[in-house]
Amino acid sequence: MVLSQQRTGSWHIYLINVIARSDSDETISFIVLGIASSGEALLGMTEGGHMKLDAALPPSGLKDVPAIAKAAEEIGFDALWTQETLHDPFLPCALIAEHTTHLNFGTAVAVSFARSPANIAYTAWDLAAQSNGRFILGLGTQVRAHIERRFGQPWPESPVKKLREQIEVIRAFWDCWQNGTKLNYRGEYYKITLMSPFFQPSPLTSPPAPLLKKRGALIPIYIAGVNTGLAKLAGELCEGFHVHPFHSPRYLKEVMLPAIEEGAKKTNRKREDVSVSVTAFVATTPEEMNFARAQISFYASTPSYRPVMDLHGWSGVAEKLSAHASKGEWAEMPMLITDEMLSEFCLVTKEDKLASELKKRYDGIADRLTLYTPFVPRERDEWWRKTIQPFNA
């Protein structure tokens, strides 16, 4: 479903939200940023604790990736994220690695249940090697309908448990390849015991970043989730967690961060050991406010996102939005998002104050920030530079 179309110079930007629902407590939604032409920082916070500003790669085709990646690096983004929507998420990463020198990059996210752990492990290994350690592996479960009916794979009884095993198997492959450890993983979903020299890649030669080395990790793994189940898993096992754009700072502080911390305690870790990567709505013009209001109304209509609305006492509004959505009454929905709601889910500010207000809003919450606004080279380049500069100071 296309919610909006914006024109920026010579580009048309289509913002599409694809949401699927399941009976589990985890629902993943992807933002499709479709673009058509008309004419040591891997973990987020460094040892010094700086918040990083990243960009999302619009899925406009592989031929556009080198130019976008070079521009993102030149302007000063810390990382560039790919998505699995219109295109494969890993192929652009190979081009980003080839055409940049210091830009971090990764998947946000690749659908894990559509692939075997071996597929993921080999691809991530090659990207880490090609980029001298700049690749971040981001995984998400997707939902039952897409896994079964689009990817043709079985849906697990416990998505969280299967993702846990996938991560453990991926790391077992990496440990085998790097350290010669015998491959012998036996779980409920996977039994992986075979690795012969003919199929074993060479060890990585680039040393891991200090924070990764301290944690015994070779390649950082982030996972994405909407509710608390996967947030707990991220806290327990992963280097990072991708936060959905439909959130409020209060929801993150009171619900998601405690869940990450709860998971971290199981493995004697702290919340600070997990990089929290947040995609944020921002609006500096009336047009951007209207756009954000429309997007937020659509997210708020989704039953799986109800806890976000419930926390703020807006359950009744969420029910009305769901009723409108079920009837396809999209035009009526944005009017139900009050200014108070908008300010909770979107940073509304003046353009010259955006960077400082972002840092204030997400201080103590986010280690990485990606704006919902798509990055398009040669369109608003100076605006991006001014926004990024305080994050890189």
Which residues does each PLM region occupy?
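Acidic low-complexity segments
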Residues: 17-20
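A cross-taxon signal for low-complexity, glycine/charged-rich
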Residues: 5-6, 22, 26-28, 34, ...
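General helical structural elements
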Residues: 10-11, 25, 87, 119
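Active-site-adjacent structural elements that line small-molecule/cofactor binding pockets in enzymes
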Residues: 47-393
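N-terminal, intrinsically disordered charge-dense segments
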Residues: 1-13
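Intrinsically disordered, low-complexity segments enriched in polar/charged small residues
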Residues: 10-12, 26, 155, 205
